[in-house]
C-alpha cells in the first residue's frame, strides 16, 4: 500500500536527522520563537455556547411556592436575583397592606443590612453573595386580599446556594524528536517551550503548567531506535484580577478565555509542522512530531463545592456549594456524603 504524504514526510525528516548541522539545536529555538511572532495577537471566540453559564441576572425575579422550598443559585461574589416574597399567583393580584419579614441563617434580616437588603416591596437582594450566606431563608407575608377581608398569612421558604464556575483546564500531551536522553539540550528546550507557551496565553489571564516531561527511546516500525520527549502540560485560567490586563464583562468567563488559549496553542503546534515542511535545510535535532498533540477537557470543583445534576437540574454544570450532610475536601467533581457535616460548604468530614 502506498504511504500517505505525511508518513513519507516524517520518514524523510528522520533520515534527514542524521545529517543535522551542529547548529540545529539553536535552530529549533529560533524556529519556536519565530512561530510565536507569527501567531496573531487575537483569535475569535468559539461560536459554541460555553460549558458554564451564569444564572445570576440582575433582572431575574424568583417567586416562592407554598408547597416546597424554592432553590435559588447565586454566583459567589455577585449580585443575586430578586427573591420575591410572593407566589406566582399572588404576584398577579393586588395585596392590601402587605407586611414582609425575612429570616435567614443568622436570624432576622433588616433592610439596613449592607449585604442582604429587603426592598420596599419585600424582595430579598444580595449585593455581594458570600459563601457563608448560603442556607434556608424564610419570608413571612401578611396581607389582605381586599380591604373588607381579614388578614391572611403566608410562609415561603427558599434554599439559596452559592455556586462557582468549575476549575476548567485543558490537559495537552505532545511528542518531540529529541537529543539523547541524557543531553542538556532537552532540558534547555523544555524550558524554552514552556516560556513560549506561557507567553502565548499570558494576555488571556491563563497559565501553562508542566505536569510531566519524560525522554524515552522508541523503536519505530521497520526502523531503528530514536529518542523522543513526551510532554504533558495543562492550560488553566487565572482569576481575572490576577492577570496582566484588567478584564470585565462576558468575555472574561474562564471558559471563553480557555477556548481562545486552546485555539492559540493548537495553531502554534500546527505552524511548527508547516514551517518544518517548508525547510530546505536539514531538520533540527529536536522537533515536534506531527499528529501527536492530544487534548483533554477537564473540570473540577473547588473544595466545599460539587456538581449534582439530579439535585441541581437548573444548574447542571455549576459547582454548587455542598449542602449539610455532604462535603468535598479536594478539587473533585462531587460532594460526598458525610452525616456529621452540619454546614454548607464543608471541606472535611469530621
Swiss-Prot record:
| Principal subcellular localization | cytoplasm
Q: What biological-process GO terms show up in the record?
A: acrosome assembly; binding of sperm to zona pellucida
Compartments, as annotated in UniProt: Cytoplasmic vesicle, Secretory vesicle, Acrosome; Secreted; Cytoplasmic vesicle, Secretory vesicle, Acrosome membrane
UniProt keywords (A-Z) are: Cytoplasmic vesicle, Glycoprotein, Membrane, Secreted, Signal
Secretion signal, residue range per the UniProt entry: 1-38
Identify the GO cellular component terms for this protein: acrosomal membrane; acrosomal vesicle; extracellular region; zona pellucida receptor complex
What tissues harbor this protein?
A: Expressed in testis. Detected in sperm cells.
Keyword Signal annotated: yes
User: Where do glycans attach?
Assistant: 113, 186, 339
Instruction: Tell me how this protein sits in the membrane.
Output: Peripheral membrane protein
Post-translational modification, as annotated? N-glycosylated.
Asked whether the keyword Zinc-finger is assigned, the reply is no
Q: One Pfam annotation, family name?
A: Sp38
Q: Which SUPFAM superfamilies match?
A: Immunoglobulin (SSF48726)
Task: Give the matching InterPro entries.
Answer: Ig-like_dom_sf (IPR036179), Ig-like_fold (IPR013783), Sp38-bd (IPR010857), ZPBP1/2_C (IPR048805), ZPBP1/2_N (IPR048806)
Superkingdom of this protein's organism: Eukaryota
| PANTHER family reported in the protein's UniProt record | ZONA PELLUCIDA BINDING PROTEIN SP38, ZONA PELLUCIDA-BINDING PROTEIN 1
The record's comment on protein family reads:
Belongs to the zona pellucida-binding protein Sp38 family.
What function is annotated for this protein? Plays a role in acrosome compaction and sperm morphogenesis. Is implicated in sperm-oocyte interaction during fertilization.
Q: What is the protein name given in its UniProt record?
A: Zona pellucida-binding protein 1
Native species = Sus scrofa (Pig)
Lineage, opening ranks: Eukaryota, Metazoa, Chordata, Craniata, Vertebrata
